[in-house]
Structure formats: C-alpha cells, structure tokens
Curated annotation (Swiss-Prot):
Belongs to the universal ribosomal protein uS11 family. GO terms for biological process: translation. Located on the platform of the 30S subunit. Gene3D superfamilies: Ribosomal protein S11. It comes from Thermoplasma volcanium (strain ATCC 51530 / DSM 4299 / JCM 9571 / NBRC 15438 / GSS1). PANTHER family: 40S RIBOSOMAL PROTEIN S14/30S RIBOSOMAL PROTEIN S11. GO terms for molecular function: rRNA binding; structural constituent of ribosome. Part of the 30S ribosomal subunit. This is Small ribosomal subunit protein uS11. Keywords: Ribonucleoprotein, Ribosomal protein, RNA-binding, rRNA-binding. SUPFAM superfamilies: Translational machinery components. One of its GO terms (cellular component) is ribonucleoprotein complex. Pfam families: Ribosomal_S11 (PF00411).
C-alpha cells in the first residue's frame, strides 16, 4: 500500500538591496513566520551583508530550519527596494535562490514582486539630477 504524503509548501520572500539581503519564509497564507535570516546575521563586516556569500550562508540557515519543519516545496518572491529607489535586485538574490535549490528544496515558481510606483514621490537628486 502506497502512503500518499502531502508536500508542505512555504513562501520565501527574498528582499535583496545593495546593502543587505533578507530571506523570510512564511506559511502559504503569509500569517506565520517559519524562518527569517539576514545577511548581517551570517557575516562579520557590514560591507559584506549584501554579498552573494552572505546570501548563500543565510539560505543555508533557512534550509536547515525548513527541514526541521518538514517543508519541501518553496514559492520564491524576489523583491528589490523599488518605489523611487532601485528596481534591480541586489547581488544576493540569485545566490540565495541557487543555494535554496541546492539544499534539496523544490522550487515551485519564482515571482518578481518589486513595488512599482504609479507616479508616486519624486526621486532624490534635485532639479538637474545627480551630477557625477
């Protein structure tokens, strides 16, 4: 007789800016936090928080917690600062996704959820922009 096991799914919210990478895993409703690790928690120097290495180590810590909670499937939502800031995810986003997949977690889908302004506030830099 075959045992039909239900795959447990989680949602990994990856916020990747130029200064830090935060990996936050919730249940499918988003109400309960299962694991949350940032780049600053795994490296010593502040300048390394956004590095791919820090994101990889953070993803490894998250995957350990997910194995304890018996979560096998992940929906990944990648977010950049957005708004009137950068709309491109930082260097840690790709490394975090790669580390999560290498840890043996099945990635169901990857979504881009960077907030896009619909003519919101003005970007900093003044009338003539940033002069380099």
């Amino acid at each position: 007789m075959e045992v039909n096991r239900m795959n447990k799914t989680g949602i990994a919210h990856i916020y990747a800016s130029q200064n830090n990478t935060i990996i936050h895993v919730t249940d499918p409703t988003g109400a309960e936090t299962i694991a949350m690790v940032s780049g600053g928690m795994v490296v010593k120097n502040d300048r390394d928080q956004a590095s791919p290495y820090a994101a990889m180590k953070a993803a490894d810590m998250v995957s350990e917690t997910l194995k304890e909670h018996e979560i096998t499937d992940l929906i990944i939502k990648v977010r950049a600062p957005g708004g009137n800031k950068s709309k491109i995810p930082g260097p840690g986003a790709q490394a975090a996704i790669r580390a999560l997949s290498r840890a043996g977690l099945k990635i169901v889908r990857i979504e881009e959820v960077t907030p896009i302004p619909h003519d919101g506030t003005k970007k900093k830099g003044g009338k003539r922009g940033r002069r380099v």
